[in-house]
Amino acid sequence: MVNLTIKREKKKIPRAFVVGTPIHHSKSPKIHNFWLKQYDLQGEYLAQEVTSEEFRDFLTSLKRRGFCGGNVTLPHKQEAFHLANYKDDVATMIGAVNTLWYEGDKLCGTNSDAYGFSANLDDSAPDWMGETALVFGAGGAARAILYALKKRGFERICLVNRTKQRAESLAEHFGKPVEVCDWYKAHEILYQADLIVNTTSVGMINSNEKESTSFFCDFHKTKTTALVTDIVYTPLVTPFLQRAKAHGLRTVDGLGMLLHQAVLGFERWFGIRPRVTKALRATILQDMGEKRG
């Protein structure tokens, strides 16, 4: 008698990662595993400590390790950009990749930081759009912010950085309406700014205290309607935001950017577009040891 039993192929459980060094501080596993549980999905999201010397080999072995994609954090974002087989327009403009996924055998990359920045402000301050933005810092994080602001149609984006040459390089890359303003004359732009953004690490836990105390922003010259935001989220309320609050200005912390930027990758790997909720924020705040929220 012929055996007609058909063996069903066991469905693979999607596995994703966050890779960087150091990686122990990353909140990404908490975020993605919260969503996996919330939506009752089978899947894994794992932190991977990988050095710069090991990173290329790690990427070439993703499928063998059972990964369908993942997040890339410091110091690997630019290397991921160079190694991905395909980069979308967002990643190309920002010059870094923080989200990877497969399309067939092709390793694809994007950068979700610009989306995370805009979505955070959409969520926390829906009327945040204006004409003039003042951005402090010209590092990797600033590139995503400039991209987001340009996409949202700001008519003037003033970039301020201690090393003016770095700011000039970014302004040339992004073109109009990005322009460079002198670090010590930033106060002259403040009274015009509808949005003020800090993309530097000044005020971050473990940052240089001398540098922190020398960083200033004369908020008493700012529009009363201006919105102030900091992409740093440890501490949740940075000295930059504290000073803005002291002058009665509206502020948005940087935690929401982290939460919202995670949405795009989760949807790629696990097939559902998750929502950033108060419950998720509370979970991450608890993990951070923060009581605010």
From Swiss-Prot:
GO terms for biological process: amino acid biosynthetic process; aromatic amino acid family biosynthetic process; chorismate biosynthetic process; shikimate metabolic process. NADP(+) binds at residues 89, 137-141, 161-166, 231, 254. Homodimer. Involved in the biosynthesis of the chorismate, which leads to the biosynthesis of aromatic amino acids. Catalyzes the reversible NADPH linked reduction of 3-dehydroshikimate (DHSA) to yield shikimate (SA). One of its GO terms (cellular component) is cytosol. GO terms for molecular function: NADP binding; shikimate 3-dehydrogenase (NADP+) activity. InterPro entries: Aminoacid_DH-like_N_sf, NAD(P)-bd_dom_sf, SDH_C, Shikimate_DH, Shikimate_DH-bd_N, Shikimate_DH_fam, Shikm_DH/Glu-tRNA_Rdtase. It is an enzyme of class 1 (oxidoreductase). Pathway: Metabolic intermediate biosynthesis; chorismate biosynthesis; chorismate from D-erythrose 4-phosphate and phosphoenolpyruvate: step 4/7. Belongs to the shikimate dehydrogenase family. Keywords: Amino-acid biosynthesis, Aromatic amino acid biosynthesis, NADP, Oxidoreductase. This is Shikimate dehydrogenase (NADP(+)).
